Design a protein with these regions (language model features):
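Non-catalytic alpha-helical scaffolds and adjoining flexible linkers that form interface surfaces
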Residues: 1-151
Length: 151
């Protein structure tokens, strides 16, 4: 549903297909945490389509010291001073995982684990960013949350 909502074409579609196939393979065969696979897929899809979040400095002011929030409106991690109403609280562990998922090679992007609380924070960030870029809520996300008990 997410891939179709972004409707990639041309070169974007060529880059999205291997990402989608890899994620589907992992969902079906790997035994990895399904929520983490979804998070990594969402983040990498955003990057492929040109919506790459800023994760190494404050997306608003450029501060590199502490980035305890993620703001889809600002376009990535933000410092305490630039925190906006849409911002999610994130830990350094979650931010490091997001950086890794964004920068790693296709073969390595899904090859890490996180504690459940960090996965939940990662999911909040990627879901909000996808919705911000699409300017709408995905009904399939609500269904998935209902099925997994995360509503």
């Amino acid at each position: 549903d997410l891939t179709a909502a972004f409707n990639p074409s041309g070169e974007d579609a060529k880059a999205v297909l291997p990402l989608l196939l890899n994620a589907l393979y992992l969902l079906a065969n790997s035994g990895k945490n399904l929520e983490l696979i979804k998070c990594v897929f969402e983040l990498r899809l955003l990057c492929v389509l040109g919506f790459s979040p800023v994760l190494d400095e404050c997306a608003s002011c450029g501060n590199v010291d502490a980035l305890p929030f993620f703001s889809p409106q600002a376009g990535g991690a933000v410092c305490r001073s630039c925190s906006a109403p849409d911002a999610c609280i994130i830990t350094e562990n979650t931010l490091d995982a997001m950086r890794y998922a964004k920068e790693a090679s296709d073969k390595k992007a899904f090859s890490f684990t996180l504690p459940p609380s960090a996965i939940d924070a990662f999911a909040r960030c990627t879901e909000k960013m996808c919705e911000a870029e699409l300017s709408r809520h995905l009904s399939s996300l609500s269904y998935l949350k209902q099925m997994t008990g995360k509503l």
